[in-house]
């Protein structure tokens, strides 16, 4: 089963894709946000191209585990995306993935000016890999919810 991972942001959406066995996530692309129609069109094209059956979208819980205003935006986007594409969209905790992605790029010697486009797709791959690891260890928590819940 191919799964697409998304790191949703106001200006960009990082995109990652898992391998056909569902074991590893790879950074794929960064969508520069222009409009809902543009965003969903690009994501729909990726879903068709890679025969994606599910999307995992980062859910930005606060460090204390509570939901903030950005969570509401992700829920709205995920619900609209699920309705438009007709495949499940699962929210998955993304706490500190962007910070981790920035640290990885820094340690790899990527100059700060070149990180902007890469950090989002790398964060998406970290979110998706976390989800894949939980599946493989059968540790999907009961509170992992899809876009229709909450």
From Swiss-Prot:
Gene Ontology process terms (BP):
rRNA 5'-end processing
Q: What class of enzyme is it?
A: hydrolase
Which EC numbers characterise this protein's activity in its record?
Answer: 3.1.-.-
Q: Which UniProt keywords apply?
A: Cytoplasm, Hydrolase, Nuclease, Ribosome biogenesis
Which Pfam family, any one of them, does this sequence belong to?
RuvX
Localization in the cell: Cytoplasm
GO cellular component terms given for this protein: cytosol
List, in alphabetical order, the Gene Ontology terms for molecular function in this entry.
nuclease activity
Q: What does this protein do?
A: Could be a nuclease involved in processing of the 5'-end of pre-16S rRNA.
> Which PANTHER family does this UniProt record tie to the protein?
POLYNUCLEOTIDYL TRANSFERASE, RIBONUCLEASE H-LIKE SUPERFAMILY PROTEIN
Q: Which HAMAP family match?
A: Nuclease_YqgF
* Protein family (similarity comment): Belongs to the YqgF nuclease family.
- The identity of this protein, by name, is Putative pre-16S rRNA nuclease
Annotated organism of origin: Syntrophus aciditrophicus (strain SB)
């Amino acid at each position: 089963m191919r799964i697409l991972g998304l790191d949703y942001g106001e200006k960009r959406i990082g995109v990652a894709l898992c391998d056909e066995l569902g074991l590893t996530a790879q950074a794929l692309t960064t969508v520069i946000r222009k409009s809902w129609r543009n965003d969903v069109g690009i994501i729909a094209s990726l879903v068709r191209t890679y025969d994606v059956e599910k999307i995992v979208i980062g859910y930005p819980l606060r460090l204390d585990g509570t939901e903030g205003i950005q969570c509401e935006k992700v829920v709205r986007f995920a619900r609209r995306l699920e309705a438009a594409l007709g495949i499940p969209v699962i929210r998955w905790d993304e706490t500190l993935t962007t910070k981790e992605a920035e640290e990885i790029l820094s340690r790899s010697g990527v100059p700060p000016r070149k990180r902007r486009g890469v950090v989002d797709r790398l964060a998406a791959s970290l979110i998706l890999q976390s989800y894949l690891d939980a599946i493989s260890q059968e540790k999907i928590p009961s509170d992992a919810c899809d876009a229709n819940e909450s």
